[in-house]
Amino acid sequence: MFSLRNLPSLAPFVSAYASLTGYVMMIKPFLEMTIPPPLQNYMISYLNSFLHSTPSTLTLIIDDHIKNGMYNELYGAAQVYISTKVNHNAERLRISRDRSEKNVNIHFSVGEVVSDIYQGIEVKWRFCVDSNKSNMVHYFGEHFKLNPDRECVELSFEKKHTELVLNSYIPYVESKAKVINNERKILKMYSYCCMYLKWQSVNLEHPSTFDTMAMNEELKRSVMGDLDRFIRRKDFYKRVGKPWKRGYLLYGPPGTGKTSLVAAIANYLKFDIYDLQLASVREDADLRRLLLGTTNSSILLVEDIDCAVDLHTRLQPKTQDDTKGSSMLTLSGLLTCIDGLWSSCGDERIVIFTTTHKERLDPALLRPGRMDMHIHMGHCCFDVFKTLASNYLGLSHDDPHHLYPEIERLIKGEVLTPAQVAEELMKNEDPDVALEGLVKVLKRKRLELEKYDGETGRGGLRKPELQFFL
């Protein structure tokens, strides 16, 4: 049986406790008589708050966009990182699946809290959407009342850990998000939404790669080499004091693969594409705001720049209609955004312009530093044809078809574009039938060209062109 005799060392403590209890019982009536009840309650409340106080908490709010419409890359990193921490036992979860994916993606919903432990401290993430924010926007002479949803992520933790969270945990989240993105990279294609004045995205699922790209092999190797050199020269650009960006001009007839080359570059570098439709941009200020909303490691694409919008150039005097408006989109504003001080607001950027008529472009747009590499996307040559035959008919380069010599003779010059050749190869899955049909088309097209050249006096063959400005 347990008794104090079994624990003689506790006897002094028991004796002291009994004495203390006796003293408290003796002075309690005295305290109740001398201290007013309100003061007693205050003292008891203060002691309870002191003994049972909870640590102060700090909450950091990470918005999806920051001032001037610039995308908050920390928000994107937080979203990616949190997606790996979602508790599947939560009460509410959001799910989605892209067309290119088999598995369902799980995201935490509004108000749901996700906990994380970092170096022994606990932090809590919470996703919020504010739908009450409204404002008036003046656009193209019209007033729009918008109610955009402002998305944000809240990060809460004990205030005493602020320095650790800001200097260590946040960089850790960003680095982990970058690794996750590289592992499951899903490229995005962004377009400008006039109604909400912001970029909206869809998944970029274009299958074009440099392996399947129907393009002159020498030209292809030159483009890939230039891209590789650009990516690894971050320190070089910083040392010489230039923004880390590169400009490419793709020019040539329709159907020569300009859009496919853009997709191949995006897939090669794992860069998102921002498709800028200049016709939807009202003035230079809107263009600056749009460019600030793009992210690093991305491609800014302006297709058919010669006919996308009637840019006012420095060689054209302003008309009376031009002076009526207080502002407009100008070539000068475009040049400032892609090559002026605004171009330094970001790293690892690629700007690509496409055009069918290079001669129509202002020379100021084509100079080195703006369009550093001019790539002529010409008609189909024999090397390009062999790539197309491999893609569409499964023919090997090492085992040429018996019609190859005749096709090589007929296809020289500006006869058919790669798109026209691909269309002929798609008409039949039998290689013999498809190539015989292509030979007939090539013969007919050459007769038409020879007749045209005889009437106009045009002669000579154009070779693939590539201009570098390093």
Curated annotation (Swiss-Prot):
Its EC number is 3.6.1.-. Residues 1-18 form the signal peptide. Coiled coil: none annotated. InterPro entries: AAA+_ATPase, AAA_N_dom, ATPase_AAA_core, Mitochondrial_chaperone_BCS1, P-loop_NTPase. GO terms for molecular function: ATP binding; ATP hydrolysis activity. Its cofactor is Mg(2+). This is AAA-ATPase At5g17730.
